[in-house]
């Protein structure tokens, strides 16, 4: 009887660091691995039951790495579970890291929109490198302490400021995305979930890019150039869970 595995994480790991780790696995003396790439809609076996709900049903699919243990009659032991930043298109099951490495290295171009009330940032990134950036702001007052008609006027004014912020960010994003000479594969969003939801309802982005929004929303304190640099890195990062035996 094998002992249960306990999952820890996730740790956000950039694809370059992940590629280095795959090399370490390959040169590990006497180790043999099973590498599974599972598209969305997968079902995990009991050995992976300690993974959190977010890993049990990822819209991008999941990568599972297990270690083959002796004697060979025993099932492979879970080692790593990875939530990829982009959707897994085709299932794979092998003793090689070749399919995983090929998936990691696929060329991609993404649009990025970071939005919080008062600030926005727009970018296009090719394989993790920013090639187009634009940032801006629009004043949106947060609080009003008086009641009555004054409060109603403030609320109407605030809604107007928010619409103007959305329109400003949407116009710039649409312009930059439309002018880009290549294909934008996906859209990545960062910022406040509610604000982003309202933004997408108001603004129609070109070429149906809004329909290709990736499920992982990026964490952003204040949209700007520094936040775009971080977003481009995080957009090509994997969420990795380590699994160890609970003895």
Pin down the residues of each PLM region:
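Terminal alpha-helical anchor/extension segments at protein ends
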Residues: 1-247
């Amino acid at each position: 009887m094998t002992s249960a595995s306990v999952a820890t994480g996730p740790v956000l790991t950039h694809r370059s660091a992940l590629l280095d780790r795959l090399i370490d696995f390959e040169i590990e003396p006497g180790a043999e691995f099973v590498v599974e790439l599972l598209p969305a809609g997968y079902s995990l076996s009991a050995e992976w039951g300690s993974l959190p709900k977010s890993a049990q049903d990822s819209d991008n699919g999941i990568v599972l790495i297990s270690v083959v243990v002796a004697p060979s009659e025993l099932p492979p032991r879970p080692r790593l579970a990875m939530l990829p930043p982009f959707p897994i298109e085709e299932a794979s099951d092998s003793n090689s890291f070749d399919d995983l490495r090929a998936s990691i290295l696929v060329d991609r171009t993404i649009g990025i929109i970071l939005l919080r009330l008062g600030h926005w940032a727009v970018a296009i990134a090719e394989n993790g490198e920013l090639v187009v950036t634009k940032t801006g702001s629009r004043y949106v007052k947060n609080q009003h302490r008086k009641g009555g008609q004054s409060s109603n006027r403030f609320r109407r004014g605030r809604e107007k400021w928010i619409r103007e912020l959305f329109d400003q960010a949407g116009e710039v994003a649409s312009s930059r995305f439309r002018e880009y000479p290549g294909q934008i594969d996906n859209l990545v969003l960062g910022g406040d979930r509610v604000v982003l939801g309202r933004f997408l309802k108001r603004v129609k982005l070109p070429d149906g890019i809004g329909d290709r929004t990736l499920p992982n929303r990026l964490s952003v304190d204040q949209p700007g150039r520094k936040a775009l640099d971080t977003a481009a890195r995080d957009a090509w990062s994997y969420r990795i869970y380590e699994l160890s035996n609970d003895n």
